[in-house]
From Swiss-Prot:
This is Photoreceptor ankyrin repeat protein. PROSITE patterns: ANK_REP_REGION, ANK_REPEAT. One of its GO terms (cellular component) is nucleus. Residues 284-297 have a biased composition (Pro residues). Keywords: ANK repeat, Cytoplasm, Nucleus, Repeat. It comes from Mus musculus.
Amino acid sequence: MSEALPFPSNKTSTPECNLKTLYWACVHNDLAELQARLDAGVSPEEASQVDSNGRTGLMVACYHGFGSIVALLSCCPFLDVNQQDKDGNTALMLAAQAGHMSLVTLLLNYFAGLDLERRDQRGLTALMKAAIQDRSECVVALLMAGADLSSVDPVRGKTALEWAVLTDSFDTAQKIRQLLRRPQAEQLSLHYQPEWPALAQLVAQAQAQAQAPAAPSLLERLQATLSLSFAQSPQEGGVLDHLVTVTTSLASPFLSTACHTLCPDHPPKLGTRGKSVPELLGTAPPPPPEPHPPQQVPVPQVFAPNQSPQSMFSQWLQSRDSTRSQVPKILLSKAPSPSARYELTLRPQGQQSLAPPVWRFQERKKKEEETEPRGGGLGQAGGSK
C-alpha cells in the first residue's frame, strides 16, 4: 500500500504552538506556563517570536487586555517593548487605542526604555491613536508620562488635540484642556499643603453674612421657591475637586499605607518624561539584542531568448536615444466585401462641393438605359399591357 502524502493545511497556526513557548502562554493567557517559561530561561529568539501579523506575545496580551500576563512580562529578559508589527503598531499603541488603562499604566511604569513617540505606518503615535478612539483616561496617562502634545502626523499635520476635536472626542478634548490649565500634579510632592485655597474667602463671607443678616427680598424668595436643582458636574477648584486632590496626595492615609513614591521631589508633569520603576531601582532586565539587517537573498534574473535585458523594461523606461534595433510592427486588417466597394468620381474643376459616389449597380443600370432604343420602351410597355 502506498503512503498518503501530507498536504499543507490552509489554517494559520501560532508559531510552535505544540511546544508551549512564551508566545503560546501569552496568547492563551496561561499565567502558570508563562512563569514556568521565565523560570526556565528565555532566549532572545523566543522573546522576539512573532505570529503571521508580526505581533509578539506582549502585543497580543495588550490587545486582549491580559493584565497578569503583561505584569509578568515586565521581568522577561531580551523583550523589546518597542517592537512593531506589520502595521507599525507597538504594544503601547494596541493597549492605548483599545482603552486598557491599567495596561497603559503598567507599560509606562514598569517597562524600561518605552518609546512614547514611536509612529506606525500612517505616522500616528500612541497619543494620537488614543485621542482618535476617545480613550480619555489613556490620553491623560500618556500626557502625564511625557508624551509630546505638540507633535503632528505627517499626513494631515494635526496634533492629538486637533484629532480629538476632528473625531468628536469631546471628553478627550476636555481632559486635555484641563491638563493644560493644571499641568502638574502638585498633590504628589512633599511640599503640598492639604488646604483649600478658597476656604478662607468663603469663611469670611459666611461670617459677614451672619453678623449683618439681611432679609431676603421678594424676588429672592420667589427664585428660591421656583428654582429646580439639577445634577451638575463637579466644578474645577470646587469642594469635590479639592476632596479628590487631598485623598490622592502623599499625605493621605489612602496612599501612605498602601505605597510610597520613589521620587517625591519630581511629581508628574505634563510633557515631562519620568523614569520607570525598574530604572529607578536598577532592576531593569537585559535589553534586547540589536536587530541584524535582513539578509538579501539574490533573485535570479531570467531573460527571454533572443532578447536583450533592456527589452525587458517598458517602453517609457527606456532612453529615447537608444540605438537598439526596433522590432517592426505588422498590422493586419480584413479586406472589405465586394458589395461594399464604391468609386469616387473626380470633382469637376470650378465646383467646390464634393461629388456623391457612383455605385456599380447604378453604373450598370445607366449603361442599360443608354443601350436600349428610345422608342422601344413605349412599345414594350404597351405590349405588356
